[in-house]
């Protein structure tokens, strides 16, 4: 009998992957966690039936959420990562020798434990000596921090369930306070294509705009995420990613599979329908 993983992108659209075997299924205090093995996408894991990471395309997401801010300000030393239990964001950050400290706050320890066992491709740098793991609510964590971080990356689930609090105005305001005077905030910004996801994207963008003087959106193609068209939010107290001297990034000699400095400029060029959504977030 064939086994398929199927995810509802809307009540009228489904996305399926043929599965060789299910490697893990469990429930934490926060969510259901499943790990599958497939020929097309390798090992992949889901939370509450929603795709989080696949071995085949994770490099796209993790390249774009990390290297865009790091190229914008190469002097980043202290980083806060919220969510990111699979470890891929931390893995990319540890490639920068100039980074001195990475605090990772993940509400669900079981996610990290499962990814350490089944997804070493992404979780293999969580033991880097610069990394400190905190298993607590990211919303509460940033409330008590002030003027500490050069970069905050919000690598969260979608804006419902355990990740819901990470899309509020209070949260973004606390992130602003936790950042130093030239700090950068980057977050996964949902998809603009399907209505439910677009609603979440517009709501988050509106709230970030209310907190930060520099507020931009960039995009990437991620095949296993709803519609494949995925957005990231870039907010900053000082740096505009389109005016930064990003060519210095090339001198680092980092080998990436997706990100490059030409793409850095191009990824901020958005389709008209997305630009119109972002311009009309106040309506």
Swiss-Prot record:
Binding residues for S-methyl-5'-thioadenosine: 31, 106, 137-138, 162
Example GO biological process: spermidine biosynthetic process
InterPro entries xref list: PABS, SAM-dependent_MTases_sf, Spermi_synthase, Spermidine_synt_N, Spermidine_synt_N_sf
Record keywords, A-Z: Cytoplasm, Polyamine biosynthesis, Spermidine biosynthesis, Transferase
GO MF term set: spermidine synthase activity
Residues binding spermidine, per UniProt: 62, 86, 155-158
Cited PANTHER family: SPERMIDINE SYNTHASE, SPERMIDINE/SPERMINE SYNTHASE
Function, in words: Catalyzes the irreversible transfer of a propylamine group from the amino donor S-adenosylmethioninamine (decarboxy-AdoMet) to putrescine (1,4-diaminobutane) to yield spermidine.
Protein's name according to its UniProt entry: Polyamine aminopropyltransferase
Naturally occurring in which organism (per UniProt): Clostridium perfringens (strain ATCC 13124 / DSM 756 / JCM 1290 / NCIMB 6125 / NCTC 8237 / Type A)
Gene: speE
């Amino acid at each position: 009998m064939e086994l398929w993983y199927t995810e509802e992108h809307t009540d009228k659209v489904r996305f399926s992957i043929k599965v060789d075997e299910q490697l893990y299924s469990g429930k934490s205090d926060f969510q259901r966690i499943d790990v599958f093995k497939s020929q097309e996408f390798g090992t992949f894991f889901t939370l509450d039936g929603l795709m989080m990471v696949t071995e085949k395309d994770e490099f796209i997401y993790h390249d774009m959420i990390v290297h865009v801010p790091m190229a914008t300000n190469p002097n980043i030393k202290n980083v806060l990562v919220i969510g990111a239990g699979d470890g891929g964001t931390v893995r990319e950050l540890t490639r920068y020798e100039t980074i001195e400290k990475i605090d990772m706050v993940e509400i669900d320890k079981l996610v990290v434990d499962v990814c350490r066992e089944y997804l070493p491709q992404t979780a293999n740098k969580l033991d880097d000596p610069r990394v400190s793991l905190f298993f607590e609510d990211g919303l509460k964590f940033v409330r008590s921090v002030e003027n500490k971080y050069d970069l905050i990356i919000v690598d969260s689930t979608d804006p419902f369930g355990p990740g819901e609090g990470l899309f509020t105005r209070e949260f973004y305001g606390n992130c602003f306070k936790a950042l130093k005077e030239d700090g950068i905030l980057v977050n996964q910004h949902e998809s603009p294509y399907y209505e439910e996801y677009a609603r979440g994207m517009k709501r988050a963008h509106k709230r970030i705009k209310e907190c930060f003087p520099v507020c931009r959106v960039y995009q990437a193609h991620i095949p296993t995420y709803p519609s494949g068209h995925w957005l990231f939010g870039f907010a900053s107290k000082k740096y505009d990613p389109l005016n930064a001297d990003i060519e210095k990034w090339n001198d680092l000699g980092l080998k990436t599979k997706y990100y490059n400095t030409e793409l850095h400029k191009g990824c901020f060029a958005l389709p008209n329908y997305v630009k119109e959504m972002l311009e009309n977030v106040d309506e």
